[in-house]
Structure formats: structure tokens, C-alpha cells
Regions:
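A residue-level signal for conserved active-site and pocket-lining positions in enzyme catalytic cores
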Residues: 1, 34, 97, 196
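Buried hydrophobic packing segments
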Residues: 38-41, 165-166, 196
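Extended helical regulatory/linker subdomains that flank P-loop NTPase cores
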Residues: 16, 47-52, 56, 60, ...
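Residue-level signal for well-ordered alpha-helical positions
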Residues: 7-8, 44, 168
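Active-site-adjacent structural elements in folded domains
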Residues: 21-26, 79-84, 132, 149, ...
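Amphipathic alpha-helical segments of the small helical/lid subdomains adjacent to P-loop NTPase cores
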Residues: 2-40, 61, 134-135
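Hydrophobic repeat-domain scaffold segments
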Residues: 73, 92, 98, 167-274
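Structural motif
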Residues: 23-33, 50-51, 83-92, 156, ...
Length: 274
């Protein structure tokens, strides 16, 4: 990352600030693992002079770079398809496709199935003058959002993009409460839920549902779950615009979980000693 940034940015001060920001969070560090995504972070940083601290804004910045800034950077003229399918509608299309596959637990898609799903979603969006095949080609070749992993076997180019677009779908349909319930029961939805929470204008109602559920189902009956503990910590540390009193509730909840874990560990030790 350090070597790449120093080669990318002519100004050493700018390179230093970028490196500091890129290494400041796990989300940005994950994106720095591949040259393409590291390039996108650099392009995004050139526009905004900052690296977003919350995961949803970070991935949105990279998606925007892929959908628009990447072509500008490479001096690629917008195709006829791009004129028919706007930046916003591409995002909507990708969010619907991502959620369909994610909810089914499918992360790798056969080309014929992917084009079928794209065609169905294009029809629902009333996009009439482009084909699913041309959309797939553009999303793969021009934008790098899909990648062919093996012969006619595709996936999103980064799992985080699949999760991000799935989160966009839940937020767009105002179903983040449903997403919260899924996240409590199924770890695969954890990142999706956290990004959805960060994308909400007011996530406090959803956060309160999680708070009460954890209190009633885990703290009061004395049931410790390490996954739920981690989820509580992630919500507390997230970039979601939570009210101060809600953050205080989650800080209290984290203490409750720690006390519960210690208490149960001590009880187990006493049983073993006995």
C-alpha cells in the first residue's frame, strides 16, 4: 500500500494522508488487498481528499468510482448502454440482482442464470433498449463489478460489493428491520445489516429493536452468545447516525455481555473444580 500510494500521488504529504486513512480501518484495509480496488481508493481520494470511516460510505465511494470515475480516469467514452441505463438505475439493478442471489445463499452464478436474472430485473425496471448480455458485458468489462471466476461462472468482483448492493436493496425497500432479524440469526447477514444501518437516515428504531431483543433473549435469561456479543460491539462502533442515548444503551449492553461472559466462565470453572 505504501509503495503504491507513493507512486500514485506526486505529493508526498497527500500520499502520507492517504496511507494513514487506508490503514485506519479493517474495511479500507480489506479493499487495499487487490490492485484494482486500491486504485479505486486512490481515485476516490483524489476527488474527496478523504477515506470514509464507515463501511457503507467506503464501498459506495468505490462503487461510484467503478461506475463513473473509473471510465473518466481511463478516458472511456460512455456507451449507448450507459446512456439508456443511468448511473442510478445501474445501482438499482445491481441491488436487486445482489439481493436475489444473497437471500438464496448463492455467491457464484452461471452465465445463463445471471443473464436471465438481469433480463427479468431490466424488464421490471422497464428498460427496453438494452439486452441482459450487453449489460453483463458492461458491468464486467467496463465497470469491473462482475468477474468471470471460471468458464461462464460469475460473481461480484468483491464479496463486499455483493453485501453492499444487498444492503441497498433492503434500505431502498425500507426493510432494515427484517434485515436486523436475519442478522441476529444468520452471521452471513452481519455485514449487510451493518451497512444497511449506516445507510439509514434514522436507524434508531432498528437499533432499539436489536437492543431490546438482546436484553430479553440473552441478558435476562443469562444466555451468552459470542456472535451476538460481536454484533452488539459492531453496532456500537459503526458509522450509523445513532442518537447519543442509543450509543449509551449499546455501551451498557456491551458491559452486560462482558459481565455475563465472565459470570458463566466462572460458573463453568467451579463445576470443573467440583
Amino acid at each position: 500500500v505504501v509503495k503504491f500510494a507513493k507512486q500514485w500521488f506526486a505529493d508526498g504529504h497527500t500520499a502520507g494522508k492517504f496511507i494513514e486513512g487506508a490503514q485506519s480501518s479493517k474495511s479500507s484495509a480489506d479493499l487495499c488487498r487487490t490492485p484494482l480496488l486500491l486504485t479505486l481508493l486512490c481515485i476516490s481520494y483524489e476527488y474527496s481528499r478523504s477515506i470514509p470511516s464507515d463501511r457503507a460510505e467506503l464501498y459506495e465511494s468505490c462503487v461510484d468510482a467503478l461506475l463513473f470515475r473509473w471510465d473518466v480516469f481511463r478516458s472511456i467514452e460512455r456507451s449507448n448502454l450507459s446512456k439508456e441505463l443511468s448511473h442510478a438505475r445501474k445501482k438499482l439493478l445491481l441491488s436487486r440482482v445482489a439481493r436475489r442471489y444473497f437471500d438464496e445463499g448463492v455467491f457464484f452464478f452461471r452465465k445463463n442464470d445471471l443473464t436471465r436474472v438481469l433480463a427479468e430485473e431490466l424488464s421490471d425496471l422497464e428498460v427496453k433498449f438494452v439486452t441482459a448480455e450487453s449489460v453483463l458485458f458492461e458491468l464486467e468489462a467496463h465497470h469491473g463489478l462482475f468477474i468471470e471466476r471460471a468458464d461462464k461462472l460469475y460473481s461480484f468482483s468483491h464479496l463486499s460489493f455483493h453485501e453492499f448492493f444487498t444492503a441497498l436493496s433492503y434500505v431502498g425497500e425500507n426493510k432494515v428491520i427484517d434485515l436486523a432479524i436475519l442478522a441476529i440469526d444468520d452471521p452471513k447477514y452481519r455485514e449487510v445489516f451493518l451497512m444497511g444501518l449506516e445507510k439509514m437516515y434514522d436507524p434508531n428504531e432498528v437499533a432499539m429493536i436489536i437492543f431490546r431483543y438482546v436484553k430479553d433473549e440473552f441478558i435476562k435469561p443469562g444466555q451468552y452468545d459470542p456472535y451476538v456479543d460481536r454484533l452488539v460491539q459492531d453496532i456500537s462502533a459503526s458509522g450509523a447516525p445513532l442518537h447519543r442515548d442509543m450509543r449509551e444503551r449499546f455501551a451498557e449492553l456491551m458491559v452486560d455481555m462482558q459481565v455475563l461472559q465472565i459470570t458463566l466462565s466462572e460458573e463453568d470453572s467451579e463445576i470443573d473444580d467440583g
